[in-house]
Design a protein with these regions (language model features):
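Conserved Rossmann-fold SDR core element
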Residues: 49, 59-76, 122-129
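A short hydrophobic alpha-helix cap/turn motif
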Residues: 19-20, 59-64, 75, 103, ...
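A glycine/serine/threonine-rich, flexible loop-to-helix segment
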Residues: 74-96, 138-142
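A short, exposed helix-loop element centered on a Lys and neighboring polar residues
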Residues: 12-13, 53
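A conserved structural motif in NAD(P)-dependent oxidoreductases
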Residues: 97-108
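Short C-terminal tail/terminal secondary-structure segment
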Residues: 113, 120-142
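Catalytic loop of short-chain dehydrogenase/reductase
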Residues: 22-47, 52-61, 74-75
Length: 142
């Protein structure tokens, strides 16, 4: 909670509320929408979503800036390599993920770019970028 929420708030309050700001984007998690994973992790990411909604109102009113959160599911990174290498676990994950894969880092970067550089109107939204994991929350396996 300290890293995912408290420090996110501290950094945002210090740097986001400026005249030149056009977009603020938070890194939430599909766990913020489903409650899955560890309780403190899910709660901290849900807190980020709630804080984002508050910031979206303030940033729009004062600076006409957008503010959103991306709620990623699994992303193929080095950090998650042990999950992918565990064949039985990976099969269970793919079985309950509608798109039958995780996002690549490049796909995550595309979303980040779109939401910060192209988007000019969507604000206050927690966007599910999970390959459908949210729809299978009761089947969470890892």
């Amino acid at each position: 909670i300290k890293v995912n929420l408290i420090r996110t708030i501290a950094v945002t309050e210090k740097y986001a509320f400026q005249k030149k700001i056009k977009s603020v984007l938070f890194n939430a998690s599909v766990s913020a929408l489903t409650g899955n994973e560890f309780a403190s992790y899910a709660a901290s990411k849900a807190g980020v979503v709630g804080y984002m909604k508050n910031c979206a109102i303030r940033l729009a009113n004062e600076y006409r800036a957008t503010c959103n959160a991306l709620c990623f599911g699994g992303i193929l990174t080095e950090l998650n390599e042990p999950v992918v290498q565990n064949k039985s676990l990976w099969k269970k994950i793919l079985d309950v993920t509608p798109l039958k894969r995780w996002a690549t880092a490049e796909e995550a970067a595309d979303w980040i770019y779109f939401m910060t550089a192209i988007n000019k109107f969507c604000t206050g939204q927690a966007i599910d970028v999970s390959g459908g994991e949210r729809n299978c929350a009761d089947l969470f396996v890892w």
